[in-house]
């Protein structure tokens, strides 16, 4: 298990710009992996440079992201895609909706796949029957109904980019 003391994010929520989302969570606890310790204290720095303290803690079969000033609870599940790459499912428990993205966890740093959603949706990444919507800030987003096409698209995208070119640093380990 790894502990990290600082979590640096480029947005006010962990996966705000996730390209894939669903009305209900698609990843179950039985399919999840648990790459972090039971409790992690972090400092988040938003795009304006404002820092806040928070905690990522394991609560039974999922992680809970406790954020000061936020009433809604955010739960996280991780699933290893390959090697140090994980799919992340972020669920807003008040709404029941889920966002999906990918992280790379190395011995000393956690990276978030950072890109405009329109970059991931090309002819090879189209998910038949799913709904696409245009967002003014993040480009396209996809309402997904199955986890497998999300896994495949994220794996393809991760294999085609270098971390320093397309990933945001989320945290560092002491």
Model-predicted segments: where are they?
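C-terminal motif of bacterial Sec signal peptides marking the signal peptidase cleavage site
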Residues: 15-18
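Calycin-type beta-barrel ligand-binding domains and close structural analogs
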Residues: 20-37, 45-51, 57-174
